[in-house]
């Protein structure tokens, strides 16, 4: 799964995509685009096709309230939902006529499907942009969680936390997801802060999707954590790590144990992981490749498909920036040079990718990880400029060898089905800790 923001994809002036489609849904429909129009180095849609990914995971594409829809310079990740069942207007060539955004989003999905690439939506049902919402106007305070003193719960750290355990909001969530799946042919849903949704609601969503034609193929996964304390009603269970056993098959969650074992804590910039030389974490790496089925992590999955191995996402630092910041050989008072392409950091990047791509389950990575994407040390770029967030297509050319390494890993997974095997009783595909020492593991995953 390749995580991508619609505007990031085509904002770079060097991308070769037409000006009228830059930052828009229709950028995904342009074929034959090349870097600076050189006719050689593929960008955009053709680049995606060449990479070998199975799915594009799009950051929020429903209507959100944090940017003026007619301001081409405005930028936000989009985790500010207003109208859950309407495409975002700032990604349409004409935000003032509703039919345009609907048609153009469908054209984007259709183009990706023709290329054999599935489309996953990032959905944010855990809060609304503000309290002046259609939900609040329908039945005041019914759709929101409250503390005993009457204040609105803020488990999202964005305010206005919704109450999935209430029957009508649960029903709304189920119908909304099914609407996107049926009307827009969406292939999967990533639930933001999934731990703010109760397990009963998540299972209801999975059940409803399974009843649709080929619905069992639709992916459902999310973040098994919340941002702050939640006033979820007593007697319901949050969809977090501790309750993974209460979730149906076909509902997965991001595995931060894998992430942190590989590169270190996302909350401490200078803390490294296995790829930085912390060999004491090698046991965690071996557990990760087997989907943590050995019970050594914080999760107790029934099978490896319940966990998503990853090392980078839109949150926190890009993988490249994190590796630069956590390099143990960097002097504490020295500023890292994020544009310097040194072999040491490139090796760590390759090793991190090699581990993720040889884990059981369905790996996930942030767009640009494959060419050392940098945001120059910005760890939370949700409302930074598009210039900082854009996909730098020149960098993709400069790091062509790293891109080819990722292509090779993706081809390896397609060729050997054992990498995706998730059955709990499946023979271990890789190796045991007492058979291969950490240094040998590192050598096996390094070109």
Describe each PLM feature range.
Residues 14-36, 322-342, 386-387:
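A solvent-exposed, charged loop/short amphipathic helix patch at secondary-structure junctions
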Residues 206-212, 216-372, 380-382, 417-420, ...:
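Conserved alpha/beta catalytic core and glycan-binding cleft of carbohydrate-active enzymes
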Residues 397-429:
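Catalytic cores of secreted or luminal carbohydrate-active enzymes
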Residues 44, 104-108, 169, 173-180, ...:
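Alpha-helical packing segments of well-folded alpha/beta enzyme cores
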Residues 5-10, 52, 57, 62, ...:
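Short, flexible loop/turn elements at secondary-structure junctions
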Residues 7-184, 190-213, 218-219, 230-231:
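Substrate-binding/active-site clefts of carbohydrate-active enzymes
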Residues 2, 56-58, 119-121, 189, ...:
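Hydrophobic faces of well-ordered beta-strands that scaffold small-molecule active sites
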Residues 382-391:
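Acyl/amide activation-and-transfer machinery of modular secondary-metabolite enzymes
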